[in-house]
Design a protein with these regions (language model features):
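Short, positively charged and aromatic/hydrophobic N-terminal segments
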Residues: 14-15
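N-terminal glycine-rich phosphate-binding loop and ensuing alpha1 helix
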Residues: 19-69
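Short aromatic/basic micro-patch
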Residues: 35, 121, 214
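Short, high-confidence coil segments that cap the C-terminus of an alpha-helix
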Residues: 63, 109, 137-140
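Short phosphate-binding loop-to-helix
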Residues: 67, 73-132
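Conserved core of the sugar-phosphate nucleotidyltransferase
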Residues: 124-227
Length: 231
C-alpha cells in the first residue's frame, strides 16, 4: 500500500498543547446497496463482511473505539451480537461521509477515521498510515491513502477512483477517468489501453484512491454543514 497523502491543512499555524488526542474509527455501512443489496452481511470465511472490517480496525494502534454507523437494524444486530458497537443513523444520507458525520456527533474524539464497510481485507497498517500525519501535525485537518495500480484494466475502470499528487504527497486531482494522461505514449500507440500494454512501466504513473479518510473533528463538522454542489 502506498504512503498516505494529505489533502487539507490549516491556513495558518496554531500552537497546541501536547495532548493525547482520542482516535475513533467509524465504519459507514449501508444495507440497500444498488449493486449488491445486503453486502455488509455477506459471509466471508463464515463471518459477515462488516465484522472483518471491524476486527481489522480494532487492531490499529492508537484507536480507542470502533463504531459501525448504519441505516439498517440487521447490521446493528449482527455487529452487537458479535460483541461490537453499532449505531443506527439516518437512511437519507447521500454518502458515507455524511453518515460518519452524524455518528461523530455522538462520540468524543478529536480524530475520526472513516473506514469503508466493504473493505474486509484492509490492512490495519494502512489505517495507521492515514492516521500518522494527522496525529503528528495539529495543522493537518485531513488525510487519506492511495496504492499502486497493477493492470491496464484497473486504470481504465471508471469504478476505480484515481488520484494525482504533488511531490510532497498532497492530492491535486481525483477522477474516475485515467489520470495522468500520457499523451506521447497514447499518440504513439493509438490508445491508452494499447500504450499500457506496450509499455507496462506506464502503470507506475497511476494510483488508486482507497476511499479511507481521516478527519479532524472540526473539518468533518464543517464538511457536513456545506451545501451540496449544484453542478
Amino acid at each position: 500500500m502506498g504512503p498516505s497523502f494529505l489533502t487539507r491543512r490549516r491556513a495558518s499555524s496554531i500552537l497546541h498543547d501536547v495532548v493525547r488526542e482520542r482516535v475513533v474509527v467509524i465504519i459507514p455501512a449501508r444495507y440497500a446497496s444498488q449493486r449488491l443489496p445486503g453486502k455488509p452481511l455477506l459471509e466471508i470465511g463464515g463471518r459477515p463482511m462488516i465484522w472483518h472490517v471491524y476486527e481489522r480496525a480494532r487492531r490499529v494502534p492508537r484507536v480507542e473505539r470502533v463504531l459501525v454507523a448504519t441505516d439498517d437494524e440487521r447490521i446493528v444486530d449482527v455487529v452487537r451480537r458479535a460483541g461490537g458497537e453499532a449505531m443506527l443513523t439516518s437512511s437519507h444520507h447521500r454518502s458515507g461521509t455524511e453518515r460518519v458525520a452524524e455518528a461523530a456527533m455522538h462520540v468524543e474524539a478529536e480524530i475520526i477515521a472513516n473506514v469503508q464497510g466493504d473493505e474486509p481485507f484492509i490492512e490495519p497498517a494502512v489505517i495507521a498510515a492515514a492516521l500518522e500525519p494527522v496525529l503528528a501535525d495539529p495543522n493537518i485537518l485531513m488525510a487519506t491513502t492511495s496504492e499502486p495500480m497493477e493492470s491496464a484494466q484497473e486504470v481504465l475502470n471508471p469504478n476505480v477512483v484515481k488520484v494525482v499528487t504533488d511531490r510532497e504527497g498532497f492530492a491535486l486531482y481525483f477522477s474516475r477517468q485515467p489520470i495522468p494522461w500520457p499523451r506521447e505514449a497514447v499518440r504513439q500507440w493509438g490508445s491508452l489501453e494499447a500504450a499500457l500494454r506496450a509499455e507496462p512501466s506506464l502503470l507506475r504513473l497511476y494510483r488508486r484512491h482507497t476511499g479511507l479518510y481521516v478527519y479532524r473533528r472540526e473539518l468533518l463538522q464543517q464538511w457536513a454543514a456545506w451545501p451540496p454542489d449544484a453542478s
